[in-house]
């Protein structure tokens, strides 16, 4: 059955390419993602039209996973207004995932992690750089590339501890006096973020 | 196929992730030391004009801006 399909397809390829110079890349030239029974049925109904392609036919192939675990992790750390780290090779990063602090080493299992407000530390040899992230996501790929995106990331010494204490007290008070669900949620977010900054400054 | 993951409290209260993320970012910006705080607030200023269209014609534009109009 599969032999039939390729014969039918190659026949139409020859026919199509003789008609026009600018033929689209045929599905057989790209990683074949089409079901052969579908293609055969299509050919019976519409022999002059190319079978429709699926989105995966247009996607670039995934970066290959190296057979041996690389020694370094490549980190891309971006914010909406700047690219903090681009392709930096490091030994380890510790990210504040919503399930807790997660250590990422080269060869980490591919993961998408939602980040909570907390500290991210980048370890390169004995050099450790810490940032406080407001929230974001971390995409860990099979080829030991980590893409970390956050909305705000500040080095710890840019934070004013007195402002944090004031904010914490203010939101705790708002939480106690909140009425609607939305107000409660906003106050809760305030308490969580300020407690996280407090913990970060003292930890 | 129901998901068993608990819904985060902000989503249960009707907030989207983007709203949550922006609120967190604003709170962090408010806790910065002086020169960095002013820079970040300056960076986040927006200025845009919005006009709804009806009958193929733009209606009166609405201006939303963080920069004081001179």
Swiss-Prot record, chain A:
Its main location: mitochondrion. The keyword DNA-binding does not apply. GO terms for molecular function: proton-transporting ATP synthase activity, rotational mechanism; zinc ion binding. It is found in: Mitochondrion; Mitochondrion inner membrane. Keywords: ATP synthesis, CF(1), Hydrogen ion transport, Ion transport, Membrane, Mitochondrion, Mitochondrion inner membrane, Transit peptide, Transport. One of its GO terms (cellular component) is mitochondrion. InterPro entries: ATP_synth_F1_dsu/esu, ATP_synth_F1_dsu/esu_N, ATPsynth_dsu/esu_N. Transmembrane segments: none annotated. Residues 1-26 form a transit peptide. Belongs to the ATPase epsilon chain family. HAMAP family: ATP_synth_epsil_bac. Mitochondrial membrane ATP synthase (F(1)F(0) ATP synthase or Complex V) produces ATP from ADP in the presence of a proton gradient across the membrane which is generated by electron transport complexes of the respiratory chain. F-type ATPases consist of two structural domains, F(1) - containing the extramembraneous catalytic core, and F(0) - containing the membrane proton channel, linked together by a central stalk and a peripheral stalk. During catalysis, ATP turnover in the catalytic domain of F(1) is coupled via a rotary mechanism of the central stalk subunits to proton translocation. F-type ATPases have 2 components, CF(1) - the catalytic core - and CF(0) - the membrane proton channel. CF(1) has five subunits: alpha(3), beta(3), gamma(1), delta(1), epsilon(1). CF(0) has three main subunits: a, b and c. This is ATP synthase subunit delta', mitochondrial. It comes from Arabidopsis thaliana.
């Amino acid at each position: 059955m599969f032999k039939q399909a390729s014969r039918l397809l190659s026949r139409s390829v020859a026919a199509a390419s003789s008609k026009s110079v600018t033929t689209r890349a045929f599905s057989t030239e790209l990683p074949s993602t089409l079901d052969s029974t579908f293609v055969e049925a299509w050919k019976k109904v519409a022999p002059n039209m190319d079978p429709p392609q699926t989105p995966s036919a247009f996607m670039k192939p995934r970066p290959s996973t190296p057979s041996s675990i690389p020694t370094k992790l490549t980190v891309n750390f971006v914010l909406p207004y700047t690219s903090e780290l681009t392709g930096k090779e490091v030994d380890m990063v510790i990210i504040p995932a919503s399930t807790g602090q997660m250590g990422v080493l080269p060869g980490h299992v591919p993961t998408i992690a939602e980040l909570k407000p907390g500290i991210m530390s980048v370890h390169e040899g004995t050099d450790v750089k810490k940032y406080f992230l407001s929230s974001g996501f971390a995409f860990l790929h099979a080829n030991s590339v980590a893409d970390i995106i956050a909305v705000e990331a500040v080095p710890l010494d840019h934070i004013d501890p007195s402002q944090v204490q004031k904010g914490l007290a203010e939101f705790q008070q708002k939480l106690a006096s909140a009425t609607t669900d939305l107000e409660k949620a906003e106050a809760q977010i305030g308490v969580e973020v300020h407690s996280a900054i407090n913990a970060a400054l003292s930890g | 196929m129901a998901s068993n993951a608990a819904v985060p409290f902000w989503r249960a209260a009707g907030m989207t992730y983007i709203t949550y993320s922006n609120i967190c970012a604003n709170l962090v910006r408010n806790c910065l030391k002086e020169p960095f705080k002013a820079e970040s607030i300056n960076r986040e200023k927006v200025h845009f004009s919005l006009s709804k269209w009806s009958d193929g014609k733009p209606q009166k534009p609405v201006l939303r801006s963080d920069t004081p109009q001179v």
